[in-house]
Amino acid sequence: MKMIISLTFLGILMLAFAEVNSETCTLMEAAKNFDENKYFNIPLAYATHSKNREPETNVCREYSTARGPDGKTVTTFTIKDKTLTSAVKCTNTPIPGSNGQFSSDCELSAGNRITVTTSILATDNEKYAILQRCPTSGPGNILVLQTNKNGVEQGVQNYFNQKGWDISTWLSRTTVGC
């Protein structure tokens, strides 16, 4: 009887652990108006809001993009934390048949590499973008990128209203103090 109770308890623990660690990120549909040539010509964008609160440095990032010699776009984002500044360089490869979605091979400042998939959920291809990032495991995140680090572009607010999201509940540059 003790053995049955022990095995049942162990099974429940394993199931609970599996459910906690099975959270995955699924890319949402990209913006229909996404224009790669215009979008990747945005000179500098600031992460102004982050859906997830960890890590807080998500909203202390500055994004710049250039074309590499092979024609691929390379995005560099600088993390400006209160105590540390570091850069991450990502080479973006379009996902075939999915305009506005990319697989990004990123080199961290310590030399490590990670791969994330991204989807441009909404953009005007000039002043703002709402970017979803999905790592190979875990929940991922959604970031608001804007050329103006203060305020919220009307297009961002319109998208949030359409989705039923409240931007005031998201982490912002103001609340973190970048």
From Swiss-Prot:
Subcellular location: Secreted
UniProt KW Chaperone keyword: no
Any one GO cellular component localisation term in the record: extracellular region
Example GO biological process: symbiont-mediated perturbation of host defenses
Leader sequence segment: 1-18
Pfam families referenced in this protein's UniProt entry, alphabetically: Triabin
Main location (coarse class): secreted
Keywords, comma-separated and alphabetical: Disulfide bond, Hemostasis impairing toxin, Platelet aggregation inhibiting toxin, Secreted, Signal, Toxin
Gene Ontology molecular function: toxin activity
Superkingdom: Eukaryota
InterPro entries given in the database record: Calycin (IPR012674), Triabi/Procalin (IPR005657)
Disulfide bonds: C25-C134, C60-C178, C90-C106
Tissues where this protein is expressed: Expressed in salivary glands.
Protein family (similarity comment): Belongs to the calycin superfamily. Triabin family.
Function: Inhibits platelet aggregation and vasoconstriction through binding to distinct eicosanoids involved in inflammation (acts as a scavenger), and has a role in inhibiting host innate immunity by impairing platelet-assisted formation of neutrophil extracellular traps (NETs). Inhibits platelet aggregation by collagen, and low doses of thromboxane A2 mimetic (TXA2 mimetic), and arachidonic acid (AA) without affecting aggregation induced by ADP, convulxin (GP6 agonist), and PMA. Binds to TXA2, TXB2, prostaglandine H2 mimetic (PGH2 mimetic), PGJ2, and PGF2alpha.
Protein name: Platelet inhibitor triplatin-2
